[in-house]
Amino acid sequence: MSDQPDRQTKKPFLYVIVCASGIAGDVGILITAAQDANWGVGVVATPQALGFIDTKAVEAQTGYPIRSAWRSPGDPRPLPPPDAIAVAPATFNTINKWAAGISDTLALGILCEAYGFGIPTAVMPYLNSAQAAHPAYSQSLERLREMGVLIGSYEPHKPKAGGGADQYRWEEALELLTPKLSARA
């Protein structure tokens, strides 16, 4: 295991799982909010999300490397284990794969295992209303709710209308997770 200073100080550790979305570059808003609330933060990005975020800025802000690929056996773990997970922004693709138990990326692998470990998890969807109209989406959200996943309140935006970035409440992930973390303490 790597040196894990957040464990030594008893600071809770949050994994922020970032998906490839037009607002992913604003993930620093959630990181700042979590750090201001005394969380340690590590970022796990889907492979496609790496093209949407400023990786150097995120790594400087968190003090940890961004994880996107599985590590080799025997390599040190670059992040402490999570006390909670926020998936923000969560795309249509990731939500549906996660609910179906598909773990073809590190991010999805972590999410699929989180259920078995009982790690409090919040998902903050960001998608358009045409995607949300697909029956798989509502079924996936229902499955995630049954798994105890906390679902953010973002209402899907109109397709090809500029998105709803101004409506996206990054901090809601912490609002959802904090009571769950307090209950575990």
Q: Predicted regions: what is each one?
A:
Residues 1-185:
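A cross-family phosphate/adenosyl-ligand binding-site feature
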